[in-house]
């Protein structure tokens, strides 16, 4: 079994895609690519790691498809479930063969609908899309590994949009308001404003303005169309009365939440005026307000985008789905869905019990010592493999509607990637993304710890003109859809706890909104001021000629400046060094160096990475505490998914700074505090050594503070001490 204990049982195609080890783990140079307890990250290819001096078995960097750590009890349950499913699959083979033969002989017109349903379920690994009917008897289609039933599978034909039932249409209860942002941006944009802005976008001409508001910095980019007098920021919004909402939403929200809190007032002007936004100050305390604003905006857009079928207007897209929400876990999906339900107050909820059975986990599984952000992200169902279509009618919400019949699609990046298929397949299905007009990415910082390539893949396939008609009435399609300009009208909203180069690049390359885009970033006082103990913190800057040269320059500095210090320690002073390494690729490089280089042959070490299972991690922690291992190599993603409370730490070496500033506080402060309390370290004698380059400016700002970062990046000196 691969590290993590689940690689042999979580593969297959029953969730709508290939084996998890095959697509999720490629990651990036940042070592990303999986979710907690479920996800897989493929390790870099190369020779198998051979550590002759390390007693415990280590993971192989050439091993692919390994799962993230899980406890022994859940591993045992997976094994038992797998064996039972295999027996059921074998006994059902005659029946499956019969159903397969019946489907293969079915008329071609019927197969088209079944093909889509099967493709949505099976994804790229499916070789027999006709096999979807097998699932009607409760068996898993194409699942030879005995995997559990796909709770997100939908077997439903595409609806003909020209024959919509009366109950599927929304009430026309609002008078036309030409100042409504929906009308200004989508329905009836002014040609004299729109055309020069589109031309500026095509020429990559943007005008940037920096606006300071309290402790928040707003970087606003608008297409440089020569309209210098245009106001970059819309008018402030303090409550529901300032919004142009559908009447039913206005009446529902006014009694419950008439006034907005500070977070809501910050994001509402950009959000409801259809401008792209990267909000980099998401907190646990402000998460409820963010979900409220995002849900209200999504509902308002869906209700307004559903045109009157009796009018001969160009008011539609190619396909029905208008809103896409990318979320990290099933529990995060539950929170967003529940917020939507509380706002629109439907009379009926179709398939609600199925939703609760598949998405809600009420068991408490974390101890009190876990931090709030960890419990907020991983409480409930932390499965990062899901997709859910939601359809709205006048009085009903339908869960698990087929994508082409849905108004809003909720999905994790992996779940949606599986539904689309892989590039190796002859038939990819992403037409349902052709008319997405609003993308909401919540908890983007958590998605960075999964496989960010899936997010990039999804954005590359947004607003691409569809290959099939899907019953579209082209006489009703908006002209800018036909002109292949939908991406310039789509609004993208990203909420993250902090900013990273990946998020900035996503905003730069995939956000081309003609209304402009903004990045909201909080000024930071620095987490070094909030450490629970007094420790000497030394920040050492090394020079790197380019971003591509940074990994080699970092490794060279580590081996020349840090390793000799570790090798000099003797006796009891040699124990207790924790080396924190954010990137898994850097971790492999350092691990191999410690295992094979003569310079550190007298330095015993252990490792804890995101691939280490629970017994392996426990063994490494124990050996580190009792001094058998002098050095412990520890990755950022291992800390993200597990938040281990490591004891015996006397000194911390940051091979690179973490993206999440809370990790610095927990590792550099929390671990040393435990050592002081257990009398392993005298008060104030803990040591923290940090390596950084000029390309770590975003991370460094969150650690040392906005006021210090410029000096540390540009000063002639390369060593900075904090006490």
Curated annotation (Swiss-Prot):
One of its GO terms (biological process) is maturation of SSU-rRNA from tricistronic rRNA transcript (SSU-rRNA, 5.8S rRNA, LSU-rRNA). GO terms for cellular component: nucleolus; small-subunit processome. InterPro entries: P-loop_NTPase, UTP25, UTP25_C, UTP25_NTPase-like. Its main location: nucleus. Pfam families: Utp25_C, UTP25_NTPase-like. Residues 27-37 have a biased composition (Basic residues). GO terms for molecular function: rRNA binding; U3 snoRNA binding. Residues 47-59 have a biased composition (Basic and acidic residues). It is found in: Nucleus, Nucleolus. Residues 1-175 are annotated as: Disordered. The keyword rRNA processing applies. Residues 60-89, 136-161 have a biased composition (Acidic residues). Keywords: Nucleus, Ribonucleoprotein, Ribosome biogenesis, rRNA processing. Residues 1-26 have a biased composition (Gly residues). Belongs to the UTP25 family. DEAD-box RNA helicase-like protein required for pre-18S rRNA processing, specifically at sites A0, A1, and A2. Component of the ribosomal small subunit (SSU) processome composed of at least 40 protein subunits and snoRNA U3. This is U3 small nucleolar RNA-associated protein 25. It comes from Chaetomium globosum (strain ATCC 6205 / CBS 148.51 / DSM 1962 / NBRC 6347 / NRRL 1970).
């Amino acid at each position: 079994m691969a590290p993590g204990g689940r690689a042999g049982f979580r593969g297959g195609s029953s969730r709508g895609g290939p084996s998890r080890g095959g697509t999720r783990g490629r990651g990036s140079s940042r070592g990303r690519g999986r979710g907690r307890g479920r996800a897989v990250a493929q390790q870099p290819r190369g020779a198998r790691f051979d550590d002759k001096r390390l007693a415990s078995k280590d993971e192989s960097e050439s091993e692919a498809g390994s799962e993230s750590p899980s406890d022994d009890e859940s591993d045992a349950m997976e094994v038992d479930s797998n064996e039972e499913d295999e027996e059921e699959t074998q006994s059902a083979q005659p029946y499956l063969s019969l159903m397969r033969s019946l489907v293969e002989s079915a008329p071609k017109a019927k197969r088209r609908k079944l093909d889509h349903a099967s493709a949505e379920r099976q994804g790229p690994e499916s070789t027999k899309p006709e096999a979807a009917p097998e699932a009607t008897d409760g068996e898993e289609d194409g699942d030879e590994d005995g995997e559990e039933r796909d709770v997100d599978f939908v077997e439903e034909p595409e609806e003909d949009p020209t024959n919509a039932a009366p109950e599927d249409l929304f009430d026309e209860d609002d008078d036309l308001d030409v100042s409504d942002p929906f009308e200004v941006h989508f329905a009836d944009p002014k040609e004299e404003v729109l055309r020069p802005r589109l031309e500026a976008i095509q020429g990559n001409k943007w005008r940037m303005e920096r606006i300071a508001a309290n402790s928040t910095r707003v970087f606003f980019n608008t297409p440089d169309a020569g309209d210098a007098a245009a106001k970059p920021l819309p008018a402030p919004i303090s409550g529901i009365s300032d919004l142009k909402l559908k009447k039913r939403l206005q009446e529902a929200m006014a009694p419950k939440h008439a006034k907005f809190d500070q977070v809501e007032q910050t994001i509402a002007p950009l959000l409801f005026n259809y401008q792209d936004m990267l909000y980099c100050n998401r907190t646990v305390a402000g998460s409820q307000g963010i979900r409220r604003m995002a849900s209200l905006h999504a509902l308002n857009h869906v209700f307004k985008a559903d045109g009157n079928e009796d009018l001969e207007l160009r008011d539609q897209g190619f396909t029905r789905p208008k809103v896409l929400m990318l979320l990290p876990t099933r529990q995060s999906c539950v929170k967003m869905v529940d917020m939507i339900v509380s706002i629109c107050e439907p009379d009926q909820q179709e398939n609600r019990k199925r939703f609760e059975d598949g998405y809600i986990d009420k068991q408490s599984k974390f101890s009190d010592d876990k931090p709030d952000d960890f419990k907020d992200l991983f409480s409930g169902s932390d499965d990062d493999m899901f997709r859910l279509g939601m359809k709205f009618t006048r009085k009903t919400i339908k869960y698990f509607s087929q994508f082409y019949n849905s108004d809003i699609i909720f999905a994790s990046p992996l779940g949606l990637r599986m539904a689309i298929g892989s590039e190796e397949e002859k038939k990819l299905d992403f037409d349902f993304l052709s008319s997405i007009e609003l993308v909401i990415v919540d908890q983007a910082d958590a998605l960075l710890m999964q496989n960010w390539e899936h997010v990039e893949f999804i954005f590359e396939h947004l607003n691409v003109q569809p290959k099939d008609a899907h019953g579209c009435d082209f006489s009703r399609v908006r002209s800018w859809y036909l002109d292949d300009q939908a991406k310039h009208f789509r609004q993208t909203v990203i909420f993250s706890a902090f900013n990273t180069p990946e998020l900035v690049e996503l905003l730069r390359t995939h956000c081309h909104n003609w209304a402009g885009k903004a990045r909201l970033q909080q000024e930071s006082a620095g987490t070094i001021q909030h450490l629970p103990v007094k420790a000497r913190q030394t920040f050492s800057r090394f020079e790197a000629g380019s971003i591509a040269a940074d990994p080699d320059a970092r490794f060279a500095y580590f081996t020349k400046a840090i390793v000799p210090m570790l090798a000099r320690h003797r006796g009891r002073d040699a124990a207790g060094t924790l080396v924190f390494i954010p990137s898994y690729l850097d971790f492999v490089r350092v691990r191999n160096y410690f295992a094979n280089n003569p310079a550190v042959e007298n330095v015993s070490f252990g490792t804890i990475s995101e691939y280490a299972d629970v017994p392996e991690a426990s063994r490494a922690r124990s050996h580190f505490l009792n001094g058998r291992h002098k050095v412990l190599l520890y990755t950022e993603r291992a800390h993200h998914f597990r938040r281990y409370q490591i004891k015996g730490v006397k000194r911390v070496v940051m091979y690179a700074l973490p993206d999440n500033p809370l990790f610095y506080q927990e590792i550099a402060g929390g671990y040393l505090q435990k050592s002081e309390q257990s009398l392993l370290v005298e008060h104030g004698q803990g040591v923290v050594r940090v390596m950084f380059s000029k390309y770590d400016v975003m991370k460094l700002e969150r650690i040392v503070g906005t006021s210090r970062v410029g000096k540390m990046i540009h000063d002639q000196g390369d060593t900075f001490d904090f006490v």
